């Protein structure tokens, strides 16, 4: 099965002068203190879930966790299993039961301290409600993960996030799906559940930077509930899918049938998003073409000072993406371009179709078993949203992130990352768009076990 999720989340992840405004480093002392801790703290020995199941090192599948190597990509394409997977199941004498000897569980924990240039500003009034030049973002995320084969052709995966970005007291399932690698002997693979549409291109969870692939978030092609079918066709791989199009945060009671009925709606309309990707290797380069058509809520009435409210209309959107990547086992290069068209989107100009473009390019260099270095350049152009006095002027992005990771162990690393914002601040009278710089300096730890 050429599973489109080219990642291993149980071992992974996944936010100057006139031009480069100086970081506000009022908390530089604690930051330096944490760096000292990172450089001199003892490493912790731990074995992530897939490594634990098969008794292998994380380096079998990862060039540097969570970045996959070629073996790791093949492991994912083989429906998240090795040929010896049955050696790790209970011998019950029942040919129709394949239970793991133990429930396969893993944890990923991230803890940071971070200096910020951005703050929490009300786009309607310009009031700064929350402003911290540095803080302890710890834990930044705790993620519980599990995955295993259930039969010769069926596997499952889920990931539950606890305390993501300070949301303490919550448990949120971001990925949860069941996959089949050969439906009815057709060679067609299927994934049913909720997952990220953008994983067809570059899984956000396997990036080495703390900074995100911003274009995916702004285009709305991350988490959805749906189904994906995929198949190899000669040298190419084709993936097609359908999703609800309303994310994974909300469900709706189906109370029309009577009092306190158990049925629940996971979508609030009949429109669905249709998406797909065709990919192929051209020499050493992996490339693909992505497309999506679907619906989204309109951008509502423009309130005083430019604050944009959520609209009530359903409007059409289309996304076209081109992705390319390649590596030699030590240097990994990747790039993504997205073209977005949002038809009749703004309620104050409902007859106008608007478009914007965005993407990123990046490089990961595995210098040694201990050190990796990464660059990630995010760029987006608001185009037709420029001058609309709406929050969508904030699509405009121009940042460069530089990251160094030190591996205490295969599965425990320290990270230092600086994000440089090259987008000029918007000094117009409204309070939307790029009102402050978004640079930061981040230090922390990332561990999977």
Per-region residue spans from a language model:
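Outer membrane beta-barrel
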Residues: 69-70, 100-123, 129-248, 270-289, ...
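The canonical Cys-X-X-Cys-His
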Residues: 55-65
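N-terminal secretory signal peptides that target proteins for export/translocation
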Residues: 1-23
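Outer-membrane beta-barrel pore domains
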Residues: 130-131, 176-180, 284-449
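Short Fe-S-cluster ligation motifs
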Residues: 85-106
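Sequence/structural segment immediately N-terminal to covalent heme-attachment motifs in c-type
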Residues: 47-57
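Bacterial N-terminal signal peptides
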Residues: 27-38
């Amino acid at each position: 099965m050429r599973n489109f999720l080219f990642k291993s989340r149980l071992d992974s992840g996944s936010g100057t002068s006139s031009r480069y405004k100086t970081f506000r480093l009022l908390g530089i002392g604690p930051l330096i203190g944490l760096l000292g801790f990172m450089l001199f703290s003892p490493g912790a020995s731990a074995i992530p879930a897939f490594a634990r199941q098969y008794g292998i090192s994380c380096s079998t599948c990862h060039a540097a966790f969570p970045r996959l190597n070629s073996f790791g990509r093949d492991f994912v394409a083989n429906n998240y299993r090795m040929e010896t997977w049955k050696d790790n199941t209970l011998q019950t004498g029942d040919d129709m039961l394949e239970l793991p000897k133990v429930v396969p569980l893993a944890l990923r924990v991230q803890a940071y301290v971070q200096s910020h240039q951005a703050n929490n500003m009300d786009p309607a009034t310009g009031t700064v409600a929350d402003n911290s030049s540095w803080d302890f973002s710890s834990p930044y995320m705790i993620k519980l993960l599990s995955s295993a084969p259930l039969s010769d052709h069926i596997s499952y995966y889920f990931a539950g996030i606890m305390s993501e970005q300070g949301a303490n007291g919550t448990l949120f399932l971001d990925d949860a799906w069941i996959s089949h690698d050969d439906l009815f002997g057709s060679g067609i693979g299927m994934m049913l559940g909720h997952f990220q549409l953008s994983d067809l291109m570059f899984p956000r969870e396997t990036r080495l930077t703390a900074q995100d692939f911003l274009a995916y978030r702004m285009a709305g092609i991350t988490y959805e509930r749906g189904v994906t079918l995929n198949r190899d066709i000669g040298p190419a791989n084709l993936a097609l899918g359908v999703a609800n199009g309303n994310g994974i945060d909300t469900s709706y009671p189906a109370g029309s049938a009577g009092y306190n009925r158990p049925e629940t709606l996971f979508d609030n309309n009949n429109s669905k998003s249709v998406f797909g990707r065709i990919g192929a290797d051209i020499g050493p380069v992996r490339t693909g073409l992505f497309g999506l058509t679907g619906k989204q809520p309109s951008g509502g009435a423009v309130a005083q000072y430019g604050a944009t409210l959520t609209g009530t209309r359903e409007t059409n959107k289309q996304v076209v993406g081109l992705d390319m990547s390649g590596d030699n086992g030590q240097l990994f290069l990747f790039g993504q371009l997205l073209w977005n068209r949002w038809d009749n989107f703004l309620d104050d100009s409902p007859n106008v179709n608007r478009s914007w473009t965005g993407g990123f390019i990046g490089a990961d260099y595995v210098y040694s078993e201990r050190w990796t270095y990464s660059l990630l350049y995010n760029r987006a152009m608001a185009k037709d949203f420029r001058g609309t006095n709406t929050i969508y002027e904030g699509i405009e992005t121009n940042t460069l992130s530089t990251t160094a990771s030190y591996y205490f162990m295969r599965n425990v690393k320290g990270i230092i990352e600086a994000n440089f914002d090259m987008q000029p601040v918007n000094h117009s009278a409204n309070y939307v768009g790029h009102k402050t710089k978004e640079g930061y300096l981040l230090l922390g730890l990332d561990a999977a076990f």
